């Protein structure tokens, strides 16, 4: 299979633009509803999280699955109608509730009401956690700072190893990956109530590392072909470089994606959204490395050549 990327680069850019536009629209709607581009989880907003499971060792305690409507009725009675509710556990015998910050008396009152409605709860398997709003803001600030630092470090690294225009388009590709992933989860937040937490920031940082590595491999091949290859146009050189590294890109994406799909299908509730973040981000990263970063570089070098600028790579061969 041979790709002629630059002949159809307008198509690749249009696909990316459409995905990003859909995500931006969703984030705007999310901001109107949640005052945030994505639906924030407990880690960022602060509040109380209750993860409760029935005690199935008691006779007839687990005959029927827990119904969300039953839980919501209790929450309404406790004036906690805005809470997020999710049925969890084997055979739907558990429930996860995220709500506003509750004091000890309010927690006790809620768990007693749930016990009366749902049956005896397993104390050992049940958990109640509280995250203060100050800690939530600190987590968000730290996550954003980590993203900014990572982008800055990547610009420096790629500029030193290659040239600044390589670094510029590598960053454009990374922004593409982050925006596509954020847009996807913004849509999930609006349609399915999916929240993002501190693991989402970790996922974005992991996606950035994966994507820039893929881009650097392609850029390295482009540079080598420019130095030692026959006289070709920059578009031909980039197409050849992408095709030379295509097998490696596909294999890397498959070997990282398949385990993540397994985690998403068979993993626990906590890991599912994290695995989905990486699946979406790695797919976007593989796409941007092949179809965005490389074609943007070719387009820019063509413009430079028409303007009479020197586009020869003078960066060090190895670092």
UniProtKB/Swiss-Prot annotation:
Transmembrane segments: 11-31, 140-160, 168-188, 199-219, 250-270, 274-294
Entry's Gene Ontology cellular component terms: plasma membrane
GO BP annotations listed: intracellular protein transmembrane transport; protein targeting; protein transport by the Sec complex
Keyword terms: Cell inner membrane, Cell membrane, Membrane, Protein transport, Translocation, Transmembrane, Transmembrane helix, Transport
Presence of keyword Membrane: yes
SUPFAM superfamilies, per database record: Multidrug efflux transporter AcrB transmembrane domain
Gene Ontology MF, one: protein-transporting ATPase activity
InterPro entries in alphabetical order: SecD/SecF_arch_bac, SecD/SecF_bac, SecD/SecF_CS, SecD_SecF_C, SecD_SecF_C_bact, SecF_bac
Signal peptide as annotated in the record: none
Localisation per UniProt entry: Cell inner membrane
Gene3D superfamilies noted in UniProt: Multidrug efflux transporter AcrB transmembrane domain
Chief site of localization: membrane
Membrane topology: Multi-pass membrane protein
Complex and partners: Forms a complex with SecD. Part of the essential Sec protein translocation apparatus which comprises SecA, SecYEG and auxiliary proteins SecDF. Other proteins may also be involved.
Similarity comment text for this entry: Belongs to the SecD/SecF family. SecF subfamily.
Described purpose of this protein according to its UniProt entry: Part of the Sec protein translocase complex. Interacts with the SecYEG preprotein conducting channel. SecDF uses the proton motive force (PMF) to complete protein translocation after the ATP-dependent function of SecA. Probably participates in protein translocation into and across both the cytoplasmic and thylakoid membranes in cyanobacterial cells.
Protein name: Protein translocase subunit SecF
The organism's taxonomic lineage, starting at the top: Bacteria, Bacillati, Cyanobacteriota, Cyanophyceae, Acaryochloridales
Gene (UniProt): secF
């Amino acid at each position: 299979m041979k790709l002629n990327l630059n002949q159809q680069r307008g198509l690749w850019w249009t696909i990316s633009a459409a995905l990003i536009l859909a995500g931006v629209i969703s984030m705007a709607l999310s901001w109107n509803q949640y005052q945030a581009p994505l639906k924030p989880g407990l880690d960022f907003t602060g509040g109380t999280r209750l993860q409760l499971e029935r005690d199935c060792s008691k006779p007839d305690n687990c005959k029927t699955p827990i119904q969300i409507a039953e839980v919501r009725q209790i929450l309404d009675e406790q004036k906690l109608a805005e809470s997020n509710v999710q049925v969890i556990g084997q055979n739907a015998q558990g429930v996860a509730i995220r709500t506003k910050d509750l004091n000890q008396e309010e927690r006790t009152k809620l768990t007693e009401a749930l016990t009366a409605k749902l049956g005896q709860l397993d104390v050992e398997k049940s958990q109640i956690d509280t995250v203060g709003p100050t800690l939530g803001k600190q987590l968000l600030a730290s996550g954003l700072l980590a993203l900014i630092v990572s982008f800055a470090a990547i610009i420096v690294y790629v500029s030193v190893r290659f040239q600044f225009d390589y670094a510029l388009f590598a960053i454009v590709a990374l922004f593409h990956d982050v925006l596509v992933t954020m847009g996807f989860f913004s849509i999930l937040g609006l349609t399915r109530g999916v929240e993002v937490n501190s693991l989402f920031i970790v996922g974005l940082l992991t996606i950035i590392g994966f994507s820039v590595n893929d881009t650097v491999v392609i850029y390295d091949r482009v540079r080598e072909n420019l130095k030692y290859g026959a006289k070709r146009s920059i578009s031909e050189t980039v197409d050849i470089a992408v095709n030379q590294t295509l097998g490696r890109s596909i294999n890397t994406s498959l070997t990282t994606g398949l385990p993540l799909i397994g985690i998403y299908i068979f993993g626990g509730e906590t890991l599912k959204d994290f695995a989905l973040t990486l699946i979406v981000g790695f797919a976007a990263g593989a796409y941007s490395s092949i179809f965005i970063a490389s074609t943007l570089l070719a387009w820019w070098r063509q413009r430079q050549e028409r303007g009479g600028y020197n586009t020869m790579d003078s960066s060090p061969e190895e670092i």
